[in-house]
């Protein structure tokens, strides 16, 4: 009898887990044989949080997350009570997966005295916290708050400092001896400045710097410390391009809804002592490095960002640029074989290219250093590097904004004729290159702008006739640029727009900013779409921005373009209310107010559609805003005033003030003449009436009798 085959999902899952475990063990064995675990990584155990404590702190974290406090005082009182409950347990809380989130929230909301107390608790254990998976994140948040406190201490006067700290020192002075002793100890701890505490922590971490460089968690703490010591901007922990956290950490923070406070995304004033500490940090890190080890770290997945940062800031304290000259050779006009091999690896490796791009973009390296590497190893193969869509092309993009103008124009001269071939629509490659080419051209005074436009039309709308655009009935421009087929457009499952869709939409918006011909091409493509498909675009989270950015009117609009604009506006007819009540579509309806300038009939059509379903529009949160922005109350009650709004918009578009005279149209001249004649007739009628009234008055009062003329000089 054959072997019985196990069936069912559980059995399959069990087999899969077993296979994964075996693979992981074999991989771990290989890694252990290659890399030995550093012996100086602290691994202090601070204890476990029991189940009852976890429940309490978990509930407290949830309460802070909801933030349902009526006042700040109520929230501060809650934070004080939680900190009091956590007193003496802080270290085991920050190393716990659940409770570390609570400690991070408490640090974000804590006041200066509470932060100082936490600082004292962490003192002596910073190394252990920096190397731990969970506490390292808490420590990063804590360091940002500490940097803000240091700046506060530097900027406030002694009177402010004493006013904020003296009361607590003196309030229990006359109580029993034990209480007095406690207050005095607290007073002494408060006298210690945050700068002193911070420097103690910096010294505590010095023995571990070489290990922190390539450690999965401690390296992030080290990067943040270097930024603070150098007085550089401390980036957000959630933005996609942040240098503060790893990609996984940024995603996790968004999922658990931990938001940064106002202390992030800014630089802080630092005391002079920090420059000395930064110099010592860099000396400790570089003293045991040789060229081979420095290059290994620069292409190490974890250590590479640390070395990028050191190269960026070492010029502040080291005129010799020690680390730069460890990684790259000294200034020379000839190629160095070992350096040439290393640069070639940087240009072809994903981690290496990130490192190379970073040191070019940042202001740390001297321009002559970058120019030397470019001329020796890259200038003669710019096009070849631009074809490396995942590595070398990013180096070329960075160089276009760092080299001298003549070198930038040389790169543009090589790439622009091949731009259409370099962009891959199917693989979504080199769209960023096209954007950077456009930016570099604009900076250089629209250098070869027409050639760039021709190449972009050749790639994204090859059948579009620039000389006769109205003959186009294709949607190839939108399809090639946005890849509508297979996108989330029209999905009923509430799918989030993808990152690729965002990149493509931003690229198309860049094209429309570059030249108005891309906008006209977009109009024609919108009109070629089925109306239902176009309405779906207007209500899509990403593609709606493309439609919105296409609603642009030129100052000196030719007649044929105005006719095309009218045709484009016709496809909105019958869908205005639907769009007005949608979160994305409402922005488009708002934009139609400006897009219908000099087309009052189309304005009336939109307003009539909104008026026809006024109740539905007003009941919608988004519709209310559209109703207000279109001045619909005036349309409903004071049509004449609404027309004045339209007139004011037209004058503003033309740049004509109300006091500035402009050439009048024939109909306006005729109306002015009629008004003048009517005014003159009215004045003559008023004068005649006044004469008649005067004569009547004279007759009634007897003043109308003729006076006898008296001749001679004396007529009394």
From Swiss-Prot:
Function description: RNA-binding nucleolar protein required for pre-rRNA processing. Involved in production of 18S rRNA and assembly of small ribosomal subunit.
Species this protein is from: Lodderomyces elongisporus (strain ATCC 11503 / CBS 2605 / JCM 1781 / NBRC 1676 / NRRL YB-4239) (Yeast)
Pumilio repeat locations: 85-120, 121-156, 204-240, 288-325, 338-375, 377-413, 528-565, 571-608
Name of the protein described by the UniProt record: Nucleolar protein 9
Keyword Cell membrane: no
Residue ranges of the region described as Disordered: 1-38, 159-188, 675-716
InterPro entries on file: ARM-like (IPR011989), ARM-type_fold (IPR016024), NOP9 (IPR040000), Pumilio_RNA-bd_rpt (IPR001313)
UniProt entry keywords in alphabetical sequence: Nucleus, Repeat, Ribosome biogenesis, rRNA processing
């Amino acid at each position: 009898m054959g072997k019985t085959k196990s069936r069912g999902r559980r059995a399959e899952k069990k087999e899969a887990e077993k296979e994964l475990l075996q693979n992981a063990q074999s991989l771990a064995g290989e890694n252990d044989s290659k890399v030995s675990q550093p012996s100086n990584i602290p691994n202090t155990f601070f204890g476990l949080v029991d189940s009852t404590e976890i429940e309490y702190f978990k509930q407290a974290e949830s309460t802070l997350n909801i933030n349902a406090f009526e006042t700040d005082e109520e929230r501060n009182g809650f934070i004080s009570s939680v900190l009091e409950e956590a007193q003496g347990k802080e270290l085991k809380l920050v190393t716990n997966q659940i409770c570390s989130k609570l400690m991070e929230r408490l640090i974000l909301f804590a006041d200066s005295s509470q932060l100082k107390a936490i600082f004292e608790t962490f003192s002596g254990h910073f190394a252990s916290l920096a190397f731990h998976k969970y506490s390292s994140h808490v420590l990063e948040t804590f360091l940002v708050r500490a940097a803000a406190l240091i700046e506060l201490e530097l900027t406030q006067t002694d009177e402010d400092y004493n006013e904020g700290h003296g009361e607590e020192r003196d309030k229990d002075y006359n109580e029993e001896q034990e209480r007095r002793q406690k207050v005095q100890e607290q007073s002494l701890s408060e006298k210690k400045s945050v700068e002193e505490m911070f420097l103690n922590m910096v010294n505590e971490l010095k023995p571990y710097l070489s290990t922190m460089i390539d450690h999965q968690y401690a390296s992030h703490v080290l990067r943040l410390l270097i930024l603070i010591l150098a007085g550089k901007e401390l980036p957000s922990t959630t933005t996609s391009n942040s240098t503060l956290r790893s990609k996984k950490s940024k995603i996790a923070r968004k999922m658990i809804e931990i938001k940064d406070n106002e202390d992030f995304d800014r630089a802080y004033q630092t005391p002079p002592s920090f420059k000395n500490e930064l110099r010592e940090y860099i000396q400790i890190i570089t003293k045991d490095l040789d060229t081979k080890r420095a290059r290994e770290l620069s292409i190490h997945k974890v250590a590479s960002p640390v070395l990028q940062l050191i190269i960026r800031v070492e010029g502040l304290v080291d005129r010799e640029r020690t680390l730069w000259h460890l990684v790259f050779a000294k200034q020379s006009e000839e190629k160095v074989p070992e350096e040439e091999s290393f640069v070639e690896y940087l240009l072809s490796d994903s981690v290496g290219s990130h490192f190379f791009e970073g040191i070019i973009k940042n202001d740390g390296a001297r321009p002559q250093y970058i120019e030397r590497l470019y001329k020796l190893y890259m200038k003669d193969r710019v096009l070849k590097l631009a074809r490396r869509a995942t590595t070398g092309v990013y180096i070329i993009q960075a160089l276009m904004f760092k080299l001298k103008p003549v070198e930038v124009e040389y790169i543009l001269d090589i790439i622009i004729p091949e731009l259409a071939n370099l962009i891959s629509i199917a693989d979504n490659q080199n769209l960023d290159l096209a954007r950077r080419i456009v930016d570099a051209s604009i900076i250089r005074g629209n250098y070869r702008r027409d050639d760039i436009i021709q190449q972009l039309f050749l790639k994204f709308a090859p059948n579009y006739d620039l000389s006769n655009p109205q003959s186009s009935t294709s949607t190839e421009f939108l399809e090639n640029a946005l890849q509508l087929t297979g996108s989330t457009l029209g999905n009923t499952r509430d799918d989030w727009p993808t990152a690729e869709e965002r990149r493509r939409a931003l690229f198309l918006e860049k094209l429309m900013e570059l030249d108005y011909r891309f906008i006209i091409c977009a109009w024609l493509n919108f009109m070629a779409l089925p109306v239902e498909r176009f309405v779906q675009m207007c209500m899509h989270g990403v593609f709606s921005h493309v439609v919105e950015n296409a609603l642009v009117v030129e100052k000196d609009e030719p007649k044929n373009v105005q006719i095309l604009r009218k045709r484009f506006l016709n496809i909105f007819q019958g869908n205005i209310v639907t769009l007005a009540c949608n979160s994305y579509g409402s922005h488009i309806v708002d934009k139609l107010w400006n897009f219908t300038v000099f087309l009052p009939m189309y304005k009336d059509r939109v307003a009539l559609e909104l008026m026809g379903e006024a109740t539905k529009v007003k009941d919608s949160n988004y519709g209310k805003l559209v109703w207000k922005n279109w001045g619909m109350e005036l349309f409903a009650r004071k049509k004449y005033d609404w027309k004045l709004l339209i007139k004011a918009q037209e004058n503003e578009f033309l740049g004509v003030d109300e006091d500035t005279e402009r050439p009048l149209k024939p109909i306006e001249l005729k109306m002015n003449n009629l008004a003048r004649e009517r005014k003159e007739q009215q004045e003559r009628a008023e004068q005649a009436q006044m004469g008649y009234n005067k004569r009547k008055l004279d007759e009634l009062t007897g003043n109308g009798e003729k006076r006898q003329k008296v001749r001679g000089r004396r007529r009394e």
